[in-house]
């Protein structure tokens, strides 16, 4: 899947979203370390995007959602707030989920909320895809781990490229 360019689709989904969260996938996220962690660890900053507010630190919270991934793969996944750890994790991606492999370590995870119950996610692997995506929204690698609102629009030079590729 790394040979396909999903950048234009990720830019389009982000531009239609209310909020987007980006992060570089860690070795724990992709299973490279062989640890027991399940799913993708997300920043606490994404809690309002998922739950509407930051959960009370002493209360576990779950939210079931459907995510459409690149290649139109759909998952019925769960966001779980672990109060004891102060962690938010995306789990229940399903057996054989094609995108969280060790070779995806360092890839850019793009997670967008398109409407109240519609989410999209992309894994951008190549340096060119990652750079083009970040540039489209005036972001840099230092902005990973944050949520943003794309209401400022696309950079003009990438807007045309996204329309052509779509």
Locations of regions flagged by a protein language model:
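Intrinsically disordered, charged low-complexity linkers and terminal tails
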Residues: 1-166
